[in-house]
Amino acid sequence: MAQKVNPISVRLNLNRSSDSSWFSDYYYGKLLYQDLNFRDYFGSIRPPTGNTFGFRLGRCIIHHFPKRTFIHVFFLDRLSQSRHQGLGAIPSVKLIRRINDNTVKQRNEVGIWPKKRYEYHDRLPSIQKIDQLLRVSDWMADIHSTFQSIWPKDENDDRRASEERYAFSRFAPSILVAVRAEKKKAIFGSEGDFFGFTGRAFLDYFVMQYFFNLKNQIQFDPMVNRSPVAQGVAKTSMIGKAIPAKTEQGTQSGESICQPRSTLYFDAIIFLRYARFRKATSLSSRYYYLKKMQSLFSNQTKTNTLIQPVKIASVYQSASLIAQEISWKLEQKKSFRQICRSIFKQIKKCPYVKGIRIGCSGRLNGAEIAKTECKKYGETSLHVFSDQIDYAKTQASTPYGILGVKVWVSYFLTQKKGTSCAISKTYKIS
């Protein structure tokens, strides 16, 4: 019977924690509905289609507190996964460390605290700052040399060292200019980063914000905004609107009178048209978009919502990422057996993976009759409840119909010294 149920559900509170947690029985239905909306929103952000790498979501952990919501988003790093080679590119970079209750140093690095007697954290999350809720160790190791050239080396400054490890830090404008001038392309890449989808999602936010304020009849002027996008629109929108001043009216020579544009609809259309073609690549614009997305969730749920993104360096750290990669390859008309051989070849290089099982159902390779194929490598015993198993399923749209993909990944419970760990254990934060 263990093979017929979700392996995650039968292992909850054993070696797997829940993706969602809240402390309310009365608002159970409301919070469950919010979780479904949050996950649907993150899943709809630039899905991998065609030659587009897209936004690969590994896992989304949501914690609901009274008037406060924490969302931890684990996503695949675009820079560490080649779009052309796909599963064949396993980078030699440091992976995200395992988060458990055995090491005090790791708990301090990620800012997550163990459970206490009454099943809640000893320290209140509201005491911590927004940027210190979830700290990932060594994720910015590749750009360490850039910040060393900007900041003088000081071993005693812990705050400066911690700022380099934040996924989103509040850098000064001078630092942004230096980073953009020196290693902008090498650090952030061209497209497919966590906020590479900003060109479209940034537009979706202001569309929803526009209709929300229009419904409530609140004066909404996109020009009054600190965003560099809004400032650019404010400058360009006055082109062609200037009227030469007349000397009869007592104005000085060289001045101009601008026509007022207080219409809500006209301002929003100009702003959205400009934001449609804008693509945010700098760290400041991505940080600004993250804050706007948090503001959108906070307004809709009437709670203070905080989003903390965490990068995943390898696709084999999550079954969801493997399933998305297989689905993407199948949509590109790749052979299922060829995909499995490529995965099994790279699994040997991952010391934290114990085994993997892949199942695909449908009209494979255009077969007239649908069938199910299952390939496995290593040990994936579903009857042993003590095994640490991650499970995911997805669909692939092909010209012959929809193919269903299921992935089971088994990880080692103990990790050798000097090797990286899978993110399946990093979920023990509740």
From Swiss-Prot:
Pfam families on file: Ribosomal_S3_C
Record GO terms (molecular function): RNA binding; structural constituent of ribosome
Major subcellular location class: mitochondrion
Gene3D superfamilies listed in its UniProt record: Ribosomal protein S3, C-terminal domain
Localization: Mitochondrion
GO annotation, biological process: translation
GO cellular component assignments: mitochondrion; ribonucleoprotein complex; ribosome
InterPro entries on file: KH_sf_prok-type (IPR009019), Ribosomal_S3_C_sf (IPR036419), Ribosomal_uS3_C (IPR001351), Ribosomal_uS3_CS (IPR018280), Ribosomal_uS3m_plant (IPR044954)
Keywords in alphabetical order: Mitochondrion, Ribonucleoprotein, Ribosomal protein
Similarity field: Belongs to the universal ribosomal protein uS3 family.
Name of the protein described by the UniProt record: Small ribosomal subunit protein uS3m
Organism: Marchantia polymorpha
Gene: RPS3
